[in-house]
């Protein structure tokens, strides 16, 4: 038995790796834009939970004897939910909006084992630094934040521009170890059952 990560996110993989788990990577093929459109008007936590669930549900049938984890993260700032910026220009625009402000990074989790499905979200408050225009542009030029929820990373270059967080650091990076641990316990497993030691 193993953990299957229904994601191509290098950050989610690194979280599990640093916690002793070498997951099987099986990215989910989900039309996120269509799903987001269908969830229009839903609460932010529900949106990320449903995105995570859709990813896990697509992958789970291929791994009936394994634990499948789907995840999705978005940044809630000024009552607007933001995903990945994808472009340099969008990254710069977002950073000029969020610098010096507080936002909430919401990560949805879906953990599936057989017929059992656990869906939960984790929210962490982020206090963004007053980053300079030059640093914002250079950060965007690095390419690092283009495919990251909220246009930032906590564990790499983006860490320079985060003053503090309130909540679970692993959730900000993309996968809450406390949420996954609780789900494993509910499924009758120990976290250590999946350690590669």
UniProtKB/Swiss-Prot annotation:
It catalyses: a ribonucleoside 5'-triphosphate + H2O = a ribonucleoside 5'-phosphate + diphosphate + H(+); a 2'-deoxyribonucleoside 5'-triphosphate + H2O = a 2'-deoxyribonucleoside 5'-phosphate + diphosphate + H(+). The active site is at 72 (proton acceptor). Keywords: Cytoplasm, Hydrolase, Nucleotide metabolism. Its cofactor is a divalent metal cation. GO terms for cellular component: cytoplasm. It is found in: Cytoplasm. One of its GO terms (biological process) is nucleotide metabolic process. It is an enzyme of class 3 (hydrolase). Signal peptide: none annotated. PANTHER family: BIFUNCTIONAL DTTP/UTP PYROPHOSPHATASE/METHYLTRANSFERASE PROTEIN-RELATED, BIFUNCTIONAL DTTP_UTP PYROPHOSPHATASE_METHYLTRANSFERASE PROTEIN-RELATED. Belongs to the Maf family. This is Nucleoside triphosphate pyrophosphatase.
